[in-house]
């Protein structure tokens, strides 16, 4: 699985905050890392505005000492170790962006908030990484960021623009002159199909004792038809659970479930879903003549 043509297989994931990667892609990352694929995570902020679920660490939060960033960086290190991923980076690390908080909050207006970042500038920084790593596959969020968080929306914008810039000749600055353009072959957006959300809710309801709440609304779900790929990495479920547990300021993990600060329980699943947002034209698969839904891909590198 480690080779694709003349270059090693490389997977790049772009996320907004520490913990997003473990929630959306933890099993996927562990599977590909174990198979010898070069897996790289780029995190756009260190989640300074995150709610702290551990009472004894609440003083680190933005409303108190505002020292959560360094702590969450350590949690991210531990999560990556659990997943077997050795290359994880902070976007524009020397002048990094700050967590913008939820949409409409005062933290959106912080001078360093990612929401206020210049998309072209941030995209150039990410394009530099793309040219360096030369990934065939890029994973990020869809246009709404999954649930409308400003940093998720901005991560989508930056990742998509960076993929464009990385493939264009003449877009390198002085520090990139030695790096040739690179065209990402496939871009996927994370998604959470409605049927998977229902299965999670059903599993939680069947628990006789749980500290977690049920939520039937699940604002981040998509129609099942939106998913074009499912990665079954159930063999790496323990690694995903360990990675989630590493983000202890942000979530509670108990048995087969986890919950963020809203205490809504979600099943820790080894199946993770994706929507193919872009595919290099020579790799595109034609629609079936009868317009039947095509089978889901089972490999992000399918066709490469």
Curated annotation (Swiss-Prot):
Enumerate the Pfam families for this protein: PIG-L
Q: Which cofactor does it need?
A: Zn(2+)
Q: Which UniProt keywords apply?
A: Hydrolase, Metal-binding, Zinc
EC category? hydrolase
Could you provide one GO biological process annotation from this protein's UniProt record?
mycothiol biosynthetic process
**What's this protein's family per the entry?**
Belongs to the MshB deacetylase family.
Free-text function comment from the UniProt entry: Catalyzes the deacetylation of 1D-myo-inositol 2-acetamido-2-deoxy-alpha-D-glucopyranoside (GlcNAc-Ins) in the mycothiol biosynthesis pathway.
Q: What name does the UniProt record give this protein? A: 1D-myo-inositol 2-acetamido-2-deoxy-alpha-D-glucopyranoside deacetylase 2
Which organism's genome codes for this protein?
A: Catenulispora acidiphila (strain DSM 44928 / JCM 14897 / NBRC 102108 / NRRL B-24433 / ID139908)
The organism's lineage is: Bacteria, Bacillati, Actinomycetota, Actinomycetes, Catenulisporales
């Amino acid at each position: 699985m480690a080779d694709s043509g003349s270059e090693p297989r490389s997977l790049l994931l772009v996320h907004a905050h520490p913990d997003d990667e473990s929630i959306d892609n933890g099993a996927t990352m562990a599977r590909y890392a174990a198979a010898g694929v070069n897996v790289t995570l780029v995190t756009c902020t260190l989640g300074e505005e995150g709610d702290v679920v551990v009472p004894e660490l609440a003083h680190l939060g933005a409303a108190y000492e505002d020292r959560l960033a360094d702590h969450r960086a350590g949690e991210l290190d531990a999560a990556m170790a659990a997943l077997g991923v050795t290359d994880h980076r902070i976007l524009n690390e020397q002048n990094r962006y700050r967590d913008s908080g939820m949409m409409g909050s005062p933290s959106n207006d912080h001078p360093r908030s990612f929401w206020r970042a210049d998309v072209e500038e941030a995209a150039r920084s990410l394009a530099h990484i793309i040219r360096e790593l030369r990934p065939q596959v890029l994973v990020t969020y869809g246009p709404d960021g999954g649930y409308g968080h400003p940093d998720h929306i901005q991560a989508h914008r930056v990742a998509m623009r960076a993929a464009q810039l990385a493939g264009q000749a003449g877009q390198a600055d002085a520090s990139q002159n030695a790096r040739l353009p690179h065209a990402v072959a496939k871009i996927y957006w994370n998604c959470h199909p409605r049927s998977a959300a229902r299965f999670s809710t059903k599993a939680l309801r069947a628990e006789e004792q749980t500290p977690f709440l049920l939520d039937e609304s699940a604002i981040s779900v998509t129609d099942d038809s939106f998913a074009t790929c499912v990665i079954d990495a159930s063999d790496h479920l323990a690694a995903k659970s360990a990675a989630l547990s590493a983000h202890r300021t942000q979530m509670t993990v108990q048995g087969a479930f986890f919950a963020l600060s809203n205490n809504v329980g979600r099943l820790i699943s080894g199946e993770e879903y994706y929507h193919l947002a872009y595919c290099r034209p020579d790799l595109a698969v034609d629609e079936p003549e009868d317009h039947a839904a095509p089978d889901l891909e089972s490999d992000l590198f399918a066709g490469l």
